């Protein structure tokens, strides 16, 4: 894990499959199929994997279910849209291509939250949520996550850093995001709670297009890159 989350060259090299689901061994991509797929599946917790399709040889075109299972196992992040057209068209015609587009890479979802409605000035607030990743792959780059307190009265924002490492929100595993957040410096009043998951680079942190948008409906504020938790906290 320490090497996988590191910055060495080996921690930055991912995988590309040039003939995905095109033969029993993907045109020679694999020699020991089961062992090598298991290896890639584990490596893909830290580095991206993806590729493109090919004309099938000796096997039928992969079904939607087969492609979905394989992308999930190998934690796919990207798929070439230019090749191989007939395979991609089969997936489009069977109404699974749109799902693949949604699930490639990470897809972070706030599954549930238990949040108190009141807190005391200079006290603390307990953030108690469950986060899911319903995409095929984890987040690979470090991000800075903040709980945002936005005053209902005038829109003033108070930004509190979390210790949350979003890279550890893995596919198909509930992640308990529980942190005690200091309310020091936030005056009494009513506050909307929002979550900002911004880029780690200073030059990109204020650009909303580099912030992570949760997959929940009606929560994204695109102008600022904020996710509305749809909860109001009274500090008194």
Task: Show the residue positions of the predicted features.
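Catalytic-core regions of glycoside hydrolase
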Residues: 1-84
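A short linear-motif detector with a strong N-terminal bias
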Residues: 57-59, 86-93, 125-128
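Catalytic cores of secreted or luminal carbohydrate-active enzymes
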Residues: 64-115
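Extracellular/luminal regions of secreted and cell-surface proteins that mediate adhesion/ECM remodeling
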Residues: 100-236
């Amino acid at each position: 894990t320490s090497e996988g989350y590191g910055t060495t060259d080996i921690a930055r090299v991912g995988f590309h499959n040039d003939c995905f689901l095109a033969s029993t061994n993907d045109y020679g991509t694999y020699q020991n199929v089961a062992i090598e797929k298991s290896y890639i599946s584990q490596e893909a917790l830290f580095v991206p994997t993806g590729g493109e399709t090919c004309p099938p040889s000796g096997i039928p075109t992969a079904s939607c279910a087969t492609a979905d299972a394989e992308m999930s196992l190998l934690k796919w992040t990207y798929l070439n849209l230019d090749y191989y057209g007939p395979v991609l068209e089969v997936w489009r015609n069977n109404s699974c291509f749109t799902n693949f587009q949604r699930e490639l890479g990470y897809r972070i979802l706030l599954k549930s939250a238990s949040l108190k409605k009141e807190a005391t000035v200079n006290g603390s607030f307990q953030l108690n949520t469950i986060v899911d990743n319903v995409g095929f792959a984890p987040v690979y780059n470090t991000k800075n996550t903040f709980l945002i307190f936005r005053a209902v009265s005038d829109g003033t924002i108070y930004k509190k850093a979390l210790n949350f490492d979003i890279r550890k929100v893995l596919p198909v595993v509930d992640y308990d995001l529980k942190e005690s957040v200091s309310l020091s410096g936030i005056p009494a009043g009513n506050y909307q709670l929002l979550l900002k998951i911004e880029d780690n680079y200073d030059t990109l942190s204020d650009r909303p297009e580099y912030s992570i948008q949760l997959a929940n409906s009606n929560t994204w504020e695109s102008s600022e890159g904020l996710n509305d938790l749809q909860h109001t906290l009274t500090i008194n």
